[in-house]
């Protein structure tokens, strides 16, 4: 009798992490070599930040961000239009039983990190942080 894996919030398995990194590495090479005719992709330098494969490795969420300035949502939409082409190229480069179906998503983690830095550098927040550090130093003495 086959065991069924129950859905837990442990995170991705070692197999998923390894497959995701394999797909990410291959996609970076493919995107760097190929010329795209899509207007949203012309002249864009693309960073593939993360690939999250499904547990059965048949579907992969690919997170992308433009290098420099650019619209992440337009970039993801353009890559989704080219997903079948990219999947075909990916299948020729990697050795997996199934080539995963690619779903591109905008990676906003850089924007979020920049926003948090801006918040922490505001004068009112900096004053509060300095006051907190000063009171901690007094407590240690």
UniProtKB/Swiss-Prot annotation:
PROSITE patterns per UniProt: RBFA
Superkingdom in the source lineage: Bacteria
Keyword Cytoplasm: yes
Keywords annotated in UniProt: Cytoplasm, Ribosome biogenesis
GO cellular component: cytosol
Compartments where found: Cytoplasm
UniProt record, GO biological process: maturation of SSU-rRNA
InterPro entries: KH_dom-like_a/b, RbfA, RbfA_dom_sf, Ribosome-bd_factorA_CS
GO molecular function terms noted in the UniProt entry: ribosomal small subunit binding
Pfam families assigned: RBFA (PF02033)
Subunit (UniProt): Monomer. Binds 30S ribosomal subunits, but not 50S ribosomal subunits or 70S ribosomes.
Function: One of several proteins that assist in the late maturation steps of the functional core of the 30S ribosomal subunit. Associates with free 30S ribosomal subunits (but not with 30S subunits that are part of 70S ribosomes or polysomes). Required for efficient processing of 16S rRNA. May interact with the 5'-terminal helix region of 16S rRNA.
Family: Belongs to the RbfA family.
NCBIfam families reported in the protein's UniProt record: PRK00521.2-5, rbfA
Protein name: Ribosome-binding factor A
Chain's gene name: rbfA
